């Protein structure tokens, strides 16, 4: 089962738990143009593995193998992040099915839902919470 958590909870866990890791499953284009969580204060780097390929949107068939290739083990607590919590849910489910028991979906995502004017990053999510982020 995948537990939903909020960005602020994840930031606290990344700082407090040596076994905590953040896996950003957005596309390369999103990492470049929208930005990335800046985990320097937690002495970590986000792990970048796309769940879907850009621009086709096809699911990355090598996702689990790439996750294992980062050195992640079942002992790690893995927090999955996407724009607004949908792709990260799918990625976390795949990781759990592959034997990673401590997986979490960052439900509010990096940018969260759109506001009344259709803009993201204002209502909820990593950016809206004021958590550290940077351009790639």
Where are these regions (language model features)?
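Rhodanese-like catalytic fold shared by cysteine-dependent sulfurtransferases
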Residues: 1-21, 28-77, 88-136
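Conserved G/P- and acidic residue-centered "switch" motifs that form tight phosphate/ATP-binding loops
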Residues: 85
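Short, surface-exposed ligand- or partner-binding patches at beta-edge/loop junctions that are enriched
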Residues: 80-81
